[in-house]
Design a protein with these regions (language model features):
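A generic structural motif
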Residues: 24-28
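Phosphate-bearing ligand-interacting subdomains
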Residues: 37-98
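Short amphipathic alpha-helical segments
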Residues: 18-20, 77-81, 124, 197-198
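Structural signal for interior beta-strand "rungs" in well-ordered beta-sheet cores
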Residues: 92-203, 207-210
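Short alpha-helical
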Residues: 12, 73-74, 105
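Short internal beta-strands
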Residues: 29-34
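Glycine-rich adenosine-cofactor-binding loop
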Residues: 2-21
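Nucleotide donor/acceptor-binding cores
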Residues: 3, 63, 182
Length: 213
């Protein structure tokens, strides 16, 4: 059925993402786990149909999938495997999110949760995840597979590179920074006042480098 969707990744966020899918008028047809340990079980009433390998060995052409895992590198690889086999990974935007008509959001795998705001001339790349109440200000670009935790605020004119992690309630201040590097991690509640290089963790107010990753 065209409005059926299958969720990949079973865990504590399964019901949250199932509700997002349903809010976007999809019917959750089942779940797939990374291995066979839970095949045949249910999670919050949804059947666990098999492992990722089971899925890859089946006919998935034209079917819809939602990727719920938190590890963005794994998500990126799974996405490639699904698309290569004809799977579809639609972008899902909660109906009460506020999206500027001038924003540019990838049609592949973006998840925009309730009460988010994406302002004019912002760009959101493939596979990005915006948890509830994230704000992305104007003229900011999220490259592919960026994760923004609940209530993260991303100011204007900032470029955030692939697989960066913007922690819950963190603030990236407009006019103070130009970029956040690839795979950088912004700690929860951090206030970012200068550019962040790739592959580091920053935390605190003002945010400073804690360690490399």
């Amino acid at each position: 059925m065209p409005n059926e969707i299958f969720l990949l990744g079973v865990g504590h966020s399964t019901p949250f993402f199932a509700e997002l899918a349903e809010a976007c008028e999809y019917t959750v047809a089942g779940l797939y786990h990374y291995n066979d340990d839970r095949t045949g079980q249910t999670d919050h009433g949804f059947p666990i149909l098999g492992s990722f390998n089971d899925l890859y060995n089946s006919d998935i052409d034209g079917k819809n999938f939602m990727l719920t895992m938190g590890n963005m590198a794994i998500k990126r690889e799974v996405s490639k495997n699904l698309i290569r086999r004809g799977g579809i990974i639609p972008t899902l935007v909660h109906p009460n999110a506020v999206i500027s008509q001038f924003a540019d959001i990838s049609e592949c795998g973006v998840l925009v949760c309730s009460s988010c705001e994406i302002h004019s001339d912002a760009i959101v790349g493939e596979g990005c995840v915006l948890w509830p109440q994230v704000v992305v200000e104007h003229n900011t670009q999220l490259h592919d597979y960026v994760f923004c935790g609940p209530k993260a605020y991303v100011g204007a004119y900032i470029e955030i590179f692939d697989q960066a992690f913007i922690g819950q309630c963190s603030v990236c201040i407009s006019g103070k920074i130009d970029s956040i590097g690839e795979s950088a991690i912004i700690g929860a509640g951090a206030v970012v006042t200068k550019n962040v290089p790739p592959n580091v963790i920053v935390k605190g107010n003002p945010a400073t480098i804690y360690k490399k990753v």
